[in-house]
Design a protein with these regions (language model features):
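C-terminal peripheral helix-coil segments that are non-catalytic and often amphipathic
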Residues: 1-5, 104, 140, 144-152, ...
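Helix-turn-helix
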Residues: 16-19, 23, 27-61, 65
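Short amphipathic alpha-helical elements of helix-turn-helix/winged-helix folds
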Residues: 23-27, 65, 101, 105, ...
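Short coil/turn segments at alpha/beta junctions that flank glycine-rich nucleotide-binding fingerprints
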Residues: 30-34, 109, 152
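Short helix-capping/turn signature of helix-turn-helix
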Residues: 56, 116-123
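Hydrophobic alpha-helical connector segments
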Residues: 65, 79-108, 165-168, 192
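Amphipathic alpha-helical packing segments from all-alpha helical-bundle domains
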Residues: 72-79, 125-152, 162-166, 170-177
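Short, hydrophobic secondary-structure boundary micro-motifs
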Residues: 113-117, 128, 154, 158, ...
Length: 226
């Protein structure tokens, strides 16, 4: 690890927290959470140990904040997709975008994987609640698209939309959890296509190239991002 990230004023609360979290994130990745004392986080952040303790009760609370921030960002993917629907995008493209955005978020934050694995083992880390909230946001988005498509007669009549949405989302999550963070753009696009196609063919009765536009199926969502 190189020298301090930059000295921060003792009273500069928000920037101090950000700098401490940035330092902890780097150190929790390597050498790892168990091998990182608060003093080392403080040194890399360019602040005193007392300053760290002014903002965090202990090392575990720093880990918990990193995990909460990560999961909040993941949860926002579902909210962003719902609020920023492109009326000219096809329904298939909306599903594909969800998969790609979730994949890129994981790649961009791959350095947090070791810290997240540690947090999963801590009952008070808040990881479980944050994970459930993120899953709910993503699943609800998928289900709303599929239910709207059912209203237009585009889905298989023998499929329970809520059950299928949950099962398919779990499949996507399982696939993304094993994603190589060093995946190339070409690999990302290939995986995105495969997961989107699996969703589509499991639920819809028409080929993806005949997918209607969002403005035809999801008019109740349009304009919310304005």
């Amino acid at each position: 690890v190189s020298g301090p990230l930059g000295a921060v004023g003792e009273g500069d609360g928000d920037s101090t927290v950000t700098t401490v979290l940035t330092a902890a994130r780097r150190l929790f990745h390597s050498p790892g959470y168990a091998s990182t004392p608060v003093s080392r986080i403080a040194h890399l952040a360019g602040v005193s140990r007392a300053t760290v303790y002014n903002h965090f009760s202990d090392k575990r609370s720093i880990l918990n904040q990193l995990v909460r921030d990560y999961m909040a960002g993941y949860e926002q993917i579902g909210a962003h997709l719902r609020l920023q629907v492109d009326p000219k995008a096809s329904i298939f493209d909306l599903l594909r975008t969800m998969v790609r955005d979730a994949m890129l978020w994981r790649i961009d934050n791959a350095d947090l994987r070791p810290a997240i694995e540690v947090a999963k083992q801590m009952p008070d880390s808040g990881w479980r609640e944050a994970d459930e909230a993120a899953d709910r946001a993503m699943h609800d988005w998928l289900a709303s698209v599929h239910h709207a498509a059912r209203e237009r007669g585009l889905t298989r009549s023998d499929i329970d939309i809520d059950f299928a949405s949950g099962a398919l989302y779990s499949m996507i999550e399982a696939s993304l959890s094993t994603l190589n963070p060093a995946a190339s753009r070409q690999e990302v696009e290939k995986i995105t296509d495969q997961l989107a196609l699996l969703q589509w063919h499991a639920i819809y009765t028409i080929p993806p190239e005949r997918s209607p536009l969002a403005e035809e199926v999801l008019p109740f969502l349009l304009g919310r991002g304005a």
